[in-house]
């Protein structure tokens, strides 16, 4: 399966029990910041933004004072799983990032999608990739 198919079929899919509702944007990036696959609406990001995210995975709490920035948008960092998941909130939407052995799985949502739905979609794919050694 191509990386784009993972984004299209597993991240941008309709949410369980909510046909027509899906994430606003999603991507899979290598830990070097290279884009493996992304949805059309995934924001253009700066390398420094990805470096900040990677630093927070290695040093949990790094982004808390400044917020998580992606594509110029600022997210308030909320409770995640140190070293494994970063979650952010911005207005009525937010972001979930799951770190795997080689990749970062991103999901961005807006209402009516809930934080829990975004977490479930992103973390399920991230856990699958971890099981596959990726």
UniProtKB/Swiss-Prot annotation:
Keyword tags: Actin-binding, Allergen, Cytoplasm, Cytoskeleton, Disulfide bond, Phosphoprotein
Protein location: Cytoplasm, Cytoskeleton
Superkingdom assignment: Eukaryota
Keyword Disulfide bond: yes
Residues bearing PTM Phosphothreonine: 114
PROSITE patterns: PROFILIN (PS00414)
Pfam families: Profilin
Motif (Involved in PIP2 interaction): 84-100
Molecular functions per Gene Ontology: actin monomer binding
Further comment found in the protein's record: The variability of the residues taking part of IgE-binding epitopes might be responsible of the difference in cross-reactivity among olive pollen cultivars, and between distantly related pollen species, leading to a variable range of allergy reactions among atopic patients.
Family label: Belongs to the profilin family.
Function: Binds to actin and affects the structure of the cytoskeleton. At high concentrations, profilin prevents the polymerization of actin, whereas it enhances it at low concentrations.
Protein name per UniProt: Profilin-2
Provenance organism: Olea europaea (Common olive)
